[in-house]
Amino acid sequence: MIQLMLYSLIITTSIIFFNMIHPLALGLTLLIQTIFVCLLSGLMTKSFWYSYILFLIFLGGMLVLFIYVTSLASNEMFNLSIKLTLFSMFILFFMFILSMILDKTSITLFLMNNEMQSIIEMNSYFTENSLSLNKLYNFPTNFVTILLMNYLLITLIVVVKITKLFKGPIRMMS
Protein backbone atom coordinates (compact mmCIF):
# COMPACT_ATOMS: atom_id res chain seq x y z
CA MET A 1 0.00 0.00 0.00
CA ILE A 2 2.86 2.34 0.77
CA GLN A 3 4.38 1.57 -2.62
CA LEU A 4 1.12 2.45 -4.34
CA MET A 5 1.01 5.73 -2.45
CA LEU A 6 4.59 6.49 -3.46
CA TYR A 7 3.73 5.73 -7.10
CA SER A 8 0.88 8.22 -6.91
CA LEU A 9 3.12 10.85 -5.30
CA ILE A 10 5.74 10.36 -8.01
CA ILE A 11 3.09 10.78 -10.72
CA THR A 12 1.74 13.89 -8.99
CA THR A 13 5.16 15.52 -8.68
CA SER A 14 5.82 14.70 -12.34
CA ILE A 15 2.64 16.51 -13.35
CA ILE A 16 3.54 19.45 -11.12
CA PHE A 17 7.06 19.50 -12.59
CA PHE A 18 5.72 20.04 -16.10
CA ASN A 19 3.63 22.99 -14.94
CA MET A 20 6.44 24.87 -13.17
CA ILE A 21 8.27 27.75 -14.82
CA HIS A 22 10.73 29.12 -12.25
CA PRO A 23 14.08 27.25 -12.12
CA LEU A 24 14.21 27.11 -8.31
CA ALA A 25 10.71 25.64 -8.17
CA LEU A 26 11.76 23.08 -10.77
CA GLY A 27 14.76 22.13 -8.64
CA LEU A 28 12.63 21.79 -5.52
CA THR A 29 10.10 19.62 -7.33
CA LEU A 30 12.90 17.47 -8.72
CA LEU A 31 14.38 17.06 -5.23
CA ILE A 32 11.02 16.03 -3.78
CA GLN A 33 10.54 13.53 -6.58
CA THR A 34 14.01 12.13 -5.92
CA ILE A 35 13.11 11.58 -2.27
CA PHE A 36 10.00 9.67 -3.33
CA VAL A 37 11.94 7.55 -5.85
CA CYS A 38 14.60 6.72 -3.24
CA LEU A 39 11.93 5.73 -0.74
CA LEU A 40 10.26 3.55 -3.35
CA SER A 41 13.51 1.87 -4.36
CA GLY A 42 14.35 1.26 -0.71
CA LEU A 43 10.99 -0.37 -0.13
CA MET A 44 11.33 -2.51 -3.24
CA THR A 45 14.82 -3.81 -2.43
CA LYS A 46 14.07 -4.02 1.30
CA SER A 47 17.35 -2.25 2.00
CA PHE A 48 17.70 1.50 2.07
CA TRP A 49 21.46 1.39 1.59
CA TYR A 50 21.41 1.70 -2.21
CA SER A 51 18.66 4.30 -2.21
CA TYR A 52 20.57 6.32 0.40
CA ILE A 53 23.67 6.36 -1.81
CA LEU A 54 21.53 7.28 -4.82
CA PHE A 55 20.00 10.16 -2.88
CA LEU A 56 23.39 11.47 -1.74
CA ILE A 57 24.79 11.38 -5.27
CA PHE A 58 21.74 13.13 -6.67
CA LEU A 59 21.78 15.69 -3.85
CA GLY A 60 25.39 16.55 -4.66
CA GLY A 61 24.50 17.12 -8.30
CA MET A 62 21.47 19.17 -7.32
CA LEU A 63 23.60 21.40 -5.08
CA VAL A 64 25.91 22.16 -7.99
CA LEU A 65 22.90 22.96 -10.19
CA PHE A 66 21.42 25.09 -7.40
CA ILE A 67 24.58 27.20 -7.25
CA TYR A 68 24.51 27.75 -11.03
CA VAL A 69 20.80 28.54 -11.12
CA THR A 70 20.93 31.00 -8.22
CA SER A 71 23.79 32.87 -9.84
CA LEU A 72 22.07 33.01 -13.24
CA ALA A 73 18.37 33.26 -12.38
CA SER A 74 16.72 36.57 -11.81
CA ASN A 75 15.49 37.63 -8.40
CA GLU A 76 11.82 37.45 -9.26
CA MET A 77 9.51 35.62 -6.89
CA PHE A 78 7.64 32.58 -8.09
CA ASN A 79 3.95 32.42 -7.42
CA LEU A 80 1.95 29.35 -6.57
CA SER A 81 -0.99 28.90 -8.87
CA ILE A 82 -4.23 28.12 -7.05
CA LYS A 83 -5.38 26.07 -10.02
CA LEU A 84 -2.21 23.94 -9.92
CA THR A 85 -2.47 23.52 -6.14
CA LEU A 86 -6.09 22.40 -6.32
CA PHE A 87 -5.29 20.06 -9.21
CA SER A 88 -2.44 18.41 -7.31
CA MET A 89 -4.58 18.08 -4.17
CA PHE A 90 -7.33 16.47 -6.22
CA ILE A 91 -4.90 13.99 -7.77
CA LEU A 92 -3.42 13.12 -4.37
CA PHE A 93 -6.87 12.61 -2.85
CA PHE A 94 -8.01 10.53 -5.82
CA MET A 95 -4.89 8.33 -5.71
CA PHE A 96 -5.27 7.87 -1.95
CA ILE A 97 -8.90 6.78 -2.29
CA LEU A 98 -8.03 4.54 -5.24
CA SER A 99 -5.21 2.86 -3.34
CA MET A 100 -7.49 2.26 -0.37
CA ILE A 101 -10.11 0.65 -2.59
CA LEU A 102 -7.68 -1.47 -4.61
CA ASP A 103 -5.58 -2.71 -1.72
CA LYS A 104 -8.16 -4.58 0.33
CA THR A 105 -5.64 -7.11 1.65
CA SER A 106 -3.68 -4.41 3.47
CA ILE A 107 -6.82 -3.04 5.03
CA THR A 108 -7.95 -6.45 6.25
CA LEU A 109 -4.49 -7.23 7.65
CA PHE A 110 -4.45 -3.86 9.35
CA LEU A 111 -7.87 -4.41 10.86
CA MET A 112 -7.07 -7.97 11.97
CA ASN A 113 -3.86 -6.75 13.68
CA ASN A 114 -1.88 -9.72 12.47
CA GLU A 115 1.37 -9.16 14.37
CA MET A 116 2.81 -12.61 13.75
CA GLN A 117 2.76 -12.05 9.99
CA SER A 118 4.77 -8.85 10.35
CA ILE A 119 7.37 -10.59 12.53
CA ILE A 120 7.78 -13.37 9.94
CA GLU A 121 8.13 -10.79 7.15
CA MET A 122 10.74 -8.86 9.15
CA ASN A 123 12.85 -11.98 9.62
CA SER A 124 12.75 -12.73 5.89
CA TYR A 125 13.75 -9.11 5.13
CA PHE A 126 16.76 -9.33 7.43
CA THR A 127 18.02 -12.55 5.85
CA GLU A 128 17.52 -11.12 2.36
CA ASN A 129 19.43 -7.94 3.27
CA SER A 130 22.33 -9.85 4.77
CA LEU A 131 22.54 -12.05 1.67
CA SER A 132 22.68 -9.06 -0.68
CA LEU A 133 25.41 -7.41 1.40
CA ASN A 134 27.34 -10.69 1.53
CA LYS A 135 27.23 -10.83 -2.26
CA LEU A 136 28.58 -7.28 -2.41
CA TYR A 137 31.54 -7.76 -0.08
CA ASN A 138 32.52 -11.41 -0.67
CA PHE A 139 35.11 -12.88 -3.06
CA PRO A 140 34.06 -12.27 -6.65
CA THR A 141 32.81 -8.72 -6.21
CA ASN A 142 35.03 -7.43 -3.41
CA PHE A 143 37.64 -6.39 -5.98
CA VAL A 144 35.13 -4.09 -7.65
CA THR A 145 34.26 -2.55 -4.28
CA ILE A 146 37.93 -1.98 -3.44
CA LEU A 147 38.51 -0.53 -6.93
CA LEU A 148 35.64 1.93 -6.46
CA MET A 149 36.98 2.97 -3.05
CA ASN A 150 40.43 3.60 -4.51
CA TYR A 151 38.96 5.50 -7.46
CA LEU A 152 36.99 7.79 -5.15
CA LEU A 153 40.04 8.40 -2.94
CA ILE A 154 42.25 9.25 -5.92
CA THR A 155 39.55 11.52 -7.36
CA LEU A 156 39.28 13.32 -4.03
CA ILE A 157 43.04 13.85 -3.88
CA VAL A 158 43.14 15.13 -7.48
CA VAL A 159 40.30 17.59 -6.89
CA VAL A 160 41.98 18.92 -3.75
CA LYS A 161 45.29 19.35 -5.60
CA ILE A 162 43.63 21.07 -8.57
CA THR A 163 41.78 23.61 -6.45
CA LYS A 164 44.41 25.67 -4.70
CA LEU A 165 42.93 27.10 -1.56
CA PHE A 166 44.81 30.39 -1.48
CA LYS A 167 44.56 31.21 -5.19
CA GLY A 168 40.91 32.27 -5.03
CA PRO A 169 37.81 30.79 -6.63
CA ILE A 170 37.98 28.34 -9.51
CA ARG A 171 35.73 30.49 -11.71
CA MET A 172 37.45 33.64 -12.90
CA MET A 173 35.54 36.85 -12.33
CA SER A 174 35.40 39.16 -15.34
Swiss-Prot record:
Its main location: mitochondrion. GO terms for cellular component: mitochondrial membrane; respiratory chain complex I. It catalyses: a ubiquinone + NADH + 5 H(+)(in) = a ubiquinol + NAD(+) + 4 H(+)(out). InterPro entries: ComplexI_Subunit6, NADH_UbQ/plastoQ_OxRdtase_su6. Coiled coil: none annotated. It is found in: Mitochondrion membrane. Disulfide bonds: none annotated. It is an enzyme of class 7 (translocase). It comes from the Eukaryota. The keyword Transmembrane applies. It holds the Pfam family Oxidored_q3. Keywords: Electron transport, Membrane, Mitochondrion, NAD, Respiratory chain, Translocase, Transmembrane, Transmembrane helix, Transport, Ubiquinone. Core subunit of the mitochondrial membrane respiratory chain NADH dehydrogenase (Complex I) that is believed to belong to the minimal assembly required for catalysis. Complex I functions in the transfer of electrons from NADH to the respiratory chain. The immediate electron acceptor for the enzyme is believed to be ubiquinone. This is NADH-ubiquinone oxidoreductase chain 6. It comes from Drosophila yakuba (Fruit fly).
